[in-house]
A protein has these predicted regions:
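The feature encodes the CheY-like receiver
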Residues: 56
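Short amphipathic alpha-helix used as the core "switch/output" element in two-component signaling
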Residues: 39, 61-74
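Acidic, metal-coordinating helix/loop segments flanking the phosphotransfer/catalytic sites
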Residues: 30-48
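Conserved acidic carboxylate
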Residues: 8, 82
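Two-component/phosphorelay signaling modules centered on CheY-like receiver
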Residues: 11-29
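Acidic catalytic/metal-coordinating carboxylates
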Residues: 33, 59-62
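Alpha4 helix (beta4-alpha4-beta5 surface) of REC/receiver domains from two-component response regulators
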Residues: 62, 84-100, 107-110
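Active-site residues of response regulator receiver
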Residues: 52
Length: 116
């Protein structure tokens, strides 16, 4: 079973994504509100990090860059999400994929499947 670490601050999106991912057979871990994303990802070693670009207390692109600079941080596939079209910026900082919100479930699943 593939594991997904979810870094998203919108609780409605957390609930929706968790339900969709579990229905598709993924094991989901949701980031705690005060958790250090990079530290948590390196500790839990998920197959995929699904991370929002704009969170209340942090910038997903900065977290992505920090993850990629950390030892072992390049082993995790990262799919970034945002309501803003910042795909190029995400890819330049090491994301494996980007999905623009709002998105259909099948679009999400196709992106996740493409990550292996």
């Amino acid at each position: 079973m593939k594991t997904v670490f979810l870094a998203e601050d919108d609780m409605t999106m957390v609930g929706l994504l968790t339900t969709l991912l579990k229905m598709e057979g993924y094991q989901v871990t949701v980031m705690g509100r005060d958790a250090d994303i990079v530290e948590s990802v390196l500790k839990t070693k998920p197959d995929i990090l699904l991370m929002d670009v704009r969170m209340i207390d942090r910038n997903g692109i900065e977290e992505l860059a920090r993850l990629r600079k950390s030892p072992g941080g390049d082993a995790v596939h990262v799919l970034m999400t945002s309501g803003l079209d910042v795909k190029e910026q995400c890819l330049e900082n090491g994301a494996n994929g980007f999905i623009l919100k709002p998105f259909m479930p099948e679009e999400l699943f196709n992106c996740l499947r493409s990550m292996g």
